UniProtKB/Swiss-Prot annotation:
GO biological process terms on file: regulation of translational fidelity; translation
UniProt region (Disordered), positions on chain: 60-80
Biased composition (Polar residues): 66-79
Keyword Repressor recorded: no
Alphabetically ordered keywords of this record: ATP-binding, Ligase, Nucleotide-binding, Protein biosynthesis
Stated name of the protein: Glutamyl-tRNA(Gln) amidotransferase subunit C
HAMAP family named in the record: GatC
Domain of life of the organism encoding this protein: Bacteria
Gene: gatC
Family from the record: Belongs to the GatC family.
Length: 93
């Protein structure tokens, strides 16, 4: 992939960055180098590789737990509570 002025301008807009004119050629060179590394990675043949680990996230059993005192403990930490709710200053009239 060739890094030209149009692509660099589009990348500037997408990233919301402004690259000064004196740095544009340097940035183009760095981007071309990075894309070269990515192309090398894509060229690797990995179909014959086998993984030593299982590539999935084990799920835990969903067990409901009753904790009836939790709400009381939380509300006891607040100075202003009423009818099992937090009382906060009114911000909208």
């Amino acid at each position: 992939m060739q890094i030209d002025d149009a692509l660099l301008q589009r990348l500037e807009k997408l990233s919301m960055l402004e690259i000064k004119d004196e740095h544009k050629e340097s940035v183009k060179g760095h981007l071309a180098e990075v894309l070269g590394f990515v192309e090398n990675i894509f060229a690797l043949e990995t179909s014959a590789l086998k993984t030593d680990i299982e590539l999935c996230t084990p799920l835990r059993e969903d067990e409901p737990k009753s904790q009836p005192n939790t709400a009381k403990e939380i509300l006891s930490q607040n100075k202003h509570s009423q009818d099992h709710y937090f009382v906060v200053p009114k911000i909208i009239e």
